[in-house]
Curated annotation (Swiss-Prot):
Its main location: cytoplasm. This is GTPase Era. GTP binds at residues 10-17, 57-61, 116-119. Residues 146-148 are annotated as: G5. It comes from Campylobacter jejuni subsp. jejuni serotype O:2 (strain ATCC 700819 / NCTC 11168). GO terms for molecular function: GTP binding; GTPase activity; ribosomal small subunit binding; small ribosomal subunit rRNA binding. PROSITE patterns: G_ERA, KH_TYPE_2.
Length: 291
């Protein structure tokens, strides 16, 4: 029996959250085509042949001077020292420059490269990309092609990860899907629905705080505040006669209900907090709040 923690590292939009959901065969991680969508570390628990692997989905590595983005990158880098294995995820279409930047961080634990999205390319392109990474072979333990859409890739990746885990009793109940709180996952589902329903820039000025939950056998009640930085953004989030907010709520309620396996009553409010992305104390509390 082995058990351990695996940090998923990579650039924004490399497909890290989609990979987690595919390994778990359940949606718990926020997925968006927009960059820097992941803000909090999600811990997904995957059981593989009596071994327990806890995957930590981290914010994407990127360069930015914004306070929020700096804290996100710091969170990702910190997770590299708090794990047993690093899974470096890169799209098969990305250059090796991101991997070189990752190596410059001097990772101290074994790492595996996962070339994602291989279902979108041909064998010749994949072989060419594998040869480009070959010059770094002294650094990584393995390089594994992967597709989140095809289950046939799953076993090979999990087998490779288990090789580098220590013998250890389970850290969590093997029936659990995640070590993250349900509230944290629901919050990300709401944020994901904002991303899906609004233009490219507005979602980045928004955050979600769930301030009330009531869970009964047949009904889950949630009340959440969507925080944004200007009155004009508040108006866009609400929409004409509340249409946009209703659409966000409908989408989020569907995702939450599917995971919770019960009816969901979701009440959304929109609050303006100017310059919240520059308030370091607020951001630290926000990013570390799992209650």
């Amino acid at each position: 029996m082995k058990s351990g923690f695996v940090s998923i590292i990579g650039r924004t939009n490399a497909g890290k959250s989609t990979l987690i959901n595919s390994l778990l065969e359940e949606k718990i991680a926020l997925v968006s085509h927009k960059q820097n969508a992941t803000r909090r570390k999600i811990k997904a628990i995957v059981m593989h042949e009596k071994n327990q692997i806890i995957f930590i989905d981290t914010p994407g590595l990127h360069e930015s001077g914004a306070t929020l983005n700096q804290l996100l990158v710091q969170s990702a880098i910190k997770s590299m020292g708090d794990c047993d294995v690093i899974l470096f995820v890169a799209s098969v279409f990305d250059s090796t420059k991101d991997y070189e930047n990752f190596l410059s961080l001097n990772p101290q634990v074994p790492h595996i490269i996962t070339l994602n999205k291989v279902d979108l390319t041909d064998n010749a392109t994949l072989l060419k990309k594998l040869s480009e990474y070959a010059k770094f072979s002294q650094h990584f333990k393995a390089i594994i092609p992967y597709s989140s859409k095809k289950k046939s890739y799953k076993k090979g990746l999990l087998d490779e990860i288990v090789k580098y885990l220590d013998e250890h009793e389970y850290f969590y109940d093997p029936e659990f899907l995640s070590a993250s709180s349900e509230k944290e996952i629901y919050r990300d589902f709401i944020l994901e629905s904002i991303y899906e329903n609004l233009s490219d820039e507005l979602p980045y000025s928004s955050e979600v705080l769930i301030h009330r939950t009531k869970d009964t056998p047949n009904l889950l009640i949630l009340e959440a505040n969507i925080i944004t930085d200007t009155n004009s953004h508040k108006g866009m989030l609400i929409g004409k006669e509340g249409a946009t907010l209703k659409r966000i709520g409908k989408d989020a309620r569907f995702k939450i209900s599917k995971l919770a396996q019960k009816k969901v009553l979701l009440k959304l409010f929109v609050t303006v907090k100017k310059n919240w992305q520059k308030d370091e104390e607020f951001l630290k509390k926000l990013l570390n709040d799992e209650n």
